[in-house]
Amino acid sequence: MTTSRILIALAGLMGACGVMLAAAYAHLGHTGDLEAAPSMLLFHASAVLGTIALVERSVVHARIALAAAIGFVIAASLFAGDLTLRQYAGHRLFPFATPSGGTLLIASWLVLALSALWPRRRA
């Protein structure tokens, strides 16, 4: 299975989890910091899919863009996972997990920008 297909599957999982968290937030009450978790998952699932589309069309440098997509998956999962765990289990994933996820999201967006500027290899 290719990296692109794995990332597409992970984006689908992120989207499903984002919808489930949004439903939990809507039906279980607006408490805590959970509101940001579904948004991060849904938005960055779309970003992963868009990045893969750019890679498949050779618009961006493939390896750099795939690194950005992997960063989106890890970072959004870390960010949302920590907020969700804090809301429902009462403890954090690990200290500074949410800000670490946010920082990695910023870095991933910058890496994606770099992938558009970096010269692509000719086959």
Task: Locate predicted features.
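Polytopic transmembrane helical bundles with strong interfacial aromatic enrichment
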Residues: M1-A123
